[in-house]
Amino acid sequence: MKYNLPDRVLRELSYFAQKYSIEKIILFGSRARGTNKERSDIDIAVYGGDFDHFYWDVKEKVHSLLMFDIVQVDVAVSDELKQEIERDGVIIYEKA
């Protein structure tokens, strides 16, 4: 387990990121800070690619009992959220 996420979840996120040409995924929030509780959601920021298809495949097909909060950073995102992502974020996928 890496970043308080099961390896299977990381593999599935990577698979869908490649499938939909996502440039980068950043884990942020309590799981990135290491302050998460067992049932904390998974906050990810997504850059580039086919966001809509990626979003729905992750929501419907990634095998996890945890909820995902998925943010598309390429569109209007508050300055506060951008700062949190930059401060606490951990890159969990980056296109080669």
Name every feature range the model reports, one short phrase each.
Residues 1-26, 32-38, 47-96:
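Catalytic core of pol beta-like nucleotidyltransferases
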